[in-house]
Amino acid sequence: MEYASWHWIFLINIPVGIIGAIATLMLMPNYTMQTRRFDLSGFLLLAVGMAVLTLALDGSKGTGLSPLAIAGLVAVGVVALVLYLLHARNNNRALFSLKLFRTRTFSLGLAGGFAGRIGSGMLPFMTPVFLQIGLGFSPFHAGLMMIPMVLGSMGMKRIVVQVVNHFGYRRVLVATTLGLSLVTLLFMTTALLGWYYVLPFVLFLQGMVNSTRFSSMNTLTLKDLPDNLASSGNSLLSMIMQLSMSIGVTIAGLLLGLFGSQHVSVDSGTTKPSLCTPGLAWRLSSPFRRSSLPECQTIRIKTWLFRVEKGARNEVLAARYYRQTVSGDFRHLHCLADQYALGGAYQF
């Protein structure tokens, strides 16, 4: 975003995908199975059901749809999924056979993975947003901060089998689920304390824990499936993974829109819309800081107006960041303010 347009966020996937396809052709063995007729009817029912339900989740915040239209989308999605269940019942050529759910570990693993990935799917989206808006990182540096998370995730792939064989699925899943919560809280704490040099190590640890959790969950989900259902079960698992992560990003966007529209008070006595969540979090974290701001201290935000790039749908006025020095430590207070609240003094 600093050096090119936003389109390159997606275009960069093209060469990566080509390299991945070539590597697959060169390295992966070509296993063959008996082919069967493609279940076009089941595919269309599933595609329609998941697409309209995901669109309905975005709601009026992202799409501008009326409540009646959203209710209609939900109804269409539910009907499409129910029709697929009726279609797949006693149908040996169904896209995803209902016989898959007779395997208890598959059903439990699929449900647990779906719920778990809704939360974990928010992390790759919310972490850069927090680094940029909450801590004032540039888009480039926020992107660099994600590299330790990827390295931690990739590094655990080599040893996760040994970890699961030694401790067992139950202990690994319980420990990694609790560990992911603790690491996420550790990330917030270190960020609010201003220990930015610790953040790469915390993100590396987060990648390790997350990778161990879902690698063990995926193998538990598929390990008891019979050979004739293994391919279908793996495809259904991949579909549920993508759907749950999409839902996670959608929910994260809804939460950002909800809390971003909250109001804060300025010294004029009026209430103006603004996004000042980091300031609130800073106040709430005062018992854990080595030094804190004086009670009820007023910090006057210095603003620097700028307009977004030409061609944007709406011109947006915003405030850049002001660095306040307290007891020799640099404390960041970040507010994304609109034209109504600029120049105000925020109390917290």
UniProtKB/Swiss-Prot annotation:
One of its GO terms (molecular function) is transmembrane transporter activity. It is a multi-pass membrane protein. InterPro entries: MFS (IPR011701), MFS_trans_sf (IPR036259). The keyword Transport applies. Keywords: Cell inner membrane, Cell membrane, Membrane, Transmembrane, Transmembrane helix, Transport. It is found in: Cell inner membrane. Its main location: membrane. SUPFAM superfamilies: MFS general substrate transporter. GO terms for cellular component: plasma membrane. Signal peptide: none annotated. PANTHER family: BLR6921 PROTEIN, MAJOR FACILITATOR SUPERFAMILY MULTIDRUG TRANSPORTER MFSC. Belongs to the major facilitator superfamily. TCR/Tet family. This is Putative multidrug resistance protein MdtD. It comes from Shigella dysenteriae serotype 1 (strain Sd197).
